[in-house]
From Swiss-Prot:
Organism, as annotated: Alkalilimnicola ehrlichii (strain ATCC BAA-1101 / DSM 17681 / MLHE-1)
Sites where the protein binds (6S)-5,6,7,8-tetrahydrofolate: 121, 125-127, 355-357
Pathway as given in its UniProt record: One-carbon metabolism; tetrahydrofolate interconversion; Amino-acid biosynthesis; glycine biosynthesis; glycine from L-serine: step 1/1
Protein's recorded name: Serine hydroxymethyltransferase
Family: Belongs to the SHMT family.
Reactions accelerated catalytically: (6R)-5,10-methylene-5,6,7,8-tetrahydrofolate + glycine + H2O = (6S)-5,6,7,8-tetrahydrofolate + L-serine
Amino acid sequence: MFSRDMTIASFDPELSEAMEAERRRQEDHIELIASENYASPRVLEAQGSVLTNKYAEGYPGKRYYGGCEHVDEAERLAIERAKQLFGADYANVQPHSGSQANAAVYLALLQPGDTILGMSLDHGGHLTHGAKVNFSGRLFNAVQYGVCPDTGELDYAQLERLAKEHQPKMIIGGFSAYSRVVDWQRLRDIADSVGAYLLVDMAHVAGLVAAGVYPSPVQIADVTTTTTHKTLRGPRGGLILARANAEVEKKLNSLVFPGTQGGPLMHAIAGKAVAFKEALEPEFKAYQQQVVANARAMAQGLIERGYKVVSGGTDNHLFLIDLVDKGLTGKAADAALGKAHITVNKNTVPNDPQSPFVTSGLRIGTPAITTRGFKEEECRELAGWMADVLDDIENEDVIARVREQVTQVCRRLPVYQQG
C-alpha cells in the first residue's frame, strides 16, 4: 500500500536535487532552443497522474486488456481534439515521439529500399528525413534536397529536378532548422507529378499551424506528422494526422500498433488531450502571433549588430545565425552564451565548413521565452545582450554583466508563477 505523503525528496535526495536543480535552471536561464517549451501545470498534472499505471494495447473500444473504459475516453478526447485543432479527418495520438510517428508512416506506406526525397540535415532537415546515420537513411534509398546557396530559401527547382530524376515513392516536407514559409501546394504538385506520397513533418510549426499563423499542410499532404511539444506546448510525444483515406488510415493504425509500438503511454495521451484543448482557446493564437513577432524582433536586432541570419530573417518561430564571417564556431558561441545563462544550440548552416560536432551556426527559437511573457522589447534587448557576448566571447566581465541582466528579467517574468 502506498501513502500519498511519499515524496522523492525524502526517499531519494540525490535524484530530488537533480530535479530541483533543473527546475531552477529553467526559471533562471533564458531558453532559446527552438524545440523546447514549457508545458502548463495542467499538462504536468496529466503526465503525473495514475494513468501511467494502465496498460491499454490497441485502440479505444478495441483493447487487448480489460479495465480500459476510462483511458478509452481520454484517448477519444485527444483524437477528436487533434482532428478539430488541425482540420484533419484522421488522428493517431499514440506515437511516443515525432521520430516514432515518422517511422510508422514510412513502414505503413513504403517498402525497405524504396526511394524517399527529404530535406538534407545540413540544410535544415531532420534526422528522420533520410539522414545516413538514421533508420530512414538506412532502410530507404534517401535522396536529399536543400536550400538555394544565395538566398537560404528552399530550392524548389532542385527538389523538382531530383523528383523527376529519382522517382521517389515519398517526398518529405518539413524541417528542424528553416525559417521561411514552405509552399506545401508546390510540394504536392511535385509529388503528384511523379506519383509519390507527400508526407509533411510539421513538428516545429504545429503550434503556429494550429493557430492559423502558418499555412497548414494537413489537407494537402497525404499524411502529416508532428511532435506535441515544441510550439504546440504539450507533453513530449508524437501525432499522426491524415486526410480521409480508409486504406491509408488502416495501414497507419496497424503500423503504430502493433507494428512499431506496444502499449501506449496513457498519461502522455492525457497530456496531449489537455494541450490540444489549451490550443483551441483564443489566447493560443495570440501566443503564436507573439512567438513570430519575437523571432522577427530578435533576428532584426542581431542583423543590426552585424550578425548574418540565414535567409535574412524569419517567418516562424526560429532562425539561424551564420557565424562563418565572424570567425566563430557554433560550439564556442553556445558555450559563451551558456555561461551568461542564455541557452541555445549550436547548429550547422548551409555549406558549413565545420563538423556537426562543432558547426558554424546557432539555432535560435522563441517559443519558450514567449511562454514566460517576453514581448518584442525584451527580445530586442536580449538580441543586444547576445551580441555583446558574441562580440568578445572571452570577456568574462561582459558575460557576468549579461548574466545579471538575464537573472533580473527571469525574476520579473517567471515560468511558473507562485500562487
